[in-house]
A protein has these predicted regions:
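A general structural signal for well-ordered secondary-structure junctions
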Residues: 41, 85, 125-128, 149
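Asp-based, Mg2+/Mn2+-dependent phosphohydrolase catalytic module
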Residues: 1-7, 17-21, 42-45, 116-120, ...
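N-terminal helical cap/lid subdomain that shapes the substrate entry/recognition surface
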Residues: 2-111
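Substrate-recognition element of Asp-dependent hydrolases with the DxDx(T/V) motif
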Residues: 92-111, 115-143, 156-158
């Protein structure tokens, strides 16, 4: 019998209990208001429509059967179309807007019961790693937000590789 040396975990639905609602108008209203600070004046409906159009274009441009979107790249393209020329500024704003998007859409973010107790017990005997079908710009801050940073020797997030698992 082989000795178990490491244990792999998924993130959402295994360790983290999360609920989001990306249909909320507040998301697009908040982003539209934030964009005015950077000289971009759009109504929330325009923000929503453009976000989903760029997402669709991004998916169609990839040849994979299950393409992974890149939320930061969507917002970066959005900002480029709005005339924000500086790549540094676009990158920074894209990350902030992605975080706003997720933060406003999130109804719940919490650990499932006893997650830390179990991880503490397992960490004493095994190497722990995390593999998740997720966006790193959401997953990494959410790992920190619930206090799971420091438990895993390795964290693999699908968005780093541009692939996602089939539904």
């Amino acid at each position: 019998m082989m000795e178990t040396k490491a244990i792999l975990f998924d993130l959402y639905g295994t360790l983290i209990d999360i609920e989001t609602d990306e249909s909320m108008e507040e998301i697009y209203r908040g982003i539209a208001h934030y964009l005015t600070y950077h000289g971009v004046y759009l109504r929330r409906g325009e923000v929503r429509e453009r976000y989903y159009r760029i997402m669709k274009q991004q998916k169609e441009a990839r040849a994979e059967a299950y393409p992974e979107i890149d939320v930061e790249a969507i917002w970066n393209e959005f900002l480029m179309q709005e005339g924000i020329k500086s790549t540094t500024l676009r990158g920074q704003l894209a990350k902030v807007i992605a975080h706003l998007y997720r933060g406003i859409s999130r109804n719940r973010l919490q650990l499932y019961p006893d997650v830390k107790r179990v991880l503490n017990e397992l960490q004493a005997r095994y190497r722990l790693a995390l593999i998740s079908d997720a966006q790193s710009c959401f997953a990494l801050p959410e790992i920190r937000a619930v206090g799971l940073d420091g438990y895993f020797e390795s964290i693999v997030i699908s968005s780093h590789y541009g692939y996602r698992k089939p539904d």
